[in-house]
């Protein structure tokens, strides 16, 4: 299983410094390392076209993301995971769905409600959900993996 992980910023790639969230170069790779430590059954390639909190996202960032993805042979991957902030996740998802319409590889966006080093974070669960979706061959297109809360069954 070969998956391209594209880091773009957002809370999922941040650390808290006092009362402020700041993008962190080490934090984002914590996702892939945590996954490999726990499951170890995926070959990850990584890319990082930019790092920005999603409330600061502009059109040029979306174009840069598309250019980054188009620079890879996407059909050589089983899937693509894009880490992103929650504030503009829906815009980037729609943009990618238009740009990559017809791609035979799933693109799954993931984000987090808190930084990964916060015990309340859903970031790792969202990442695992994305990988599980790709492994299951559940479909092609653009998707979002996001767990809101523990709901009663």
Residue ranges: model-predicted function:
Residues 1-153:
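Active-site histidine-anchored catalytic micro-motif
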């Amino acid at each position: 299983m070969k998956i391209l992980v594209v880091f773009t910023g957002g809370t999922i790639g941040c650390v808290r410094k006092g009362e402020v969230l700041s993008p962190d170069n080490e934090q984002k790779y914590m996702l892939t390392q945590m996954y490999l430590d726990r499951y170890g059954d995926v070959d990850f390639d990584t890319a990082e076209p930019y790092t920005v909190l999603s409330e600061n996202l502009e059109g040029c960032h979306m174009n840069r993301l598309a250019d980054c993805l188009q620079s890879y042979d996407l059909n050589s991957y089983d899937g693509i995971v894009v880490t992103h902030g929650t504030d503009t996740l829906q815009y980037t998802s729609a943009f990618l769905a238009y740009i990559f319409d017809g791609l035979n590889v799933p693109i799954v966006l993931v984000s987090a409600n808190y930084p990964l080093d916060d015990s309340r974070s859903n970031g790792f669960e969202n990442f695992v959900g994305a990988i599980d979706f790709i492994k299951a061959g559940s479909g092609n297109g653009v998707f979002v993996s996001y767990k809101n809360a523990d709901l009663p069954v």
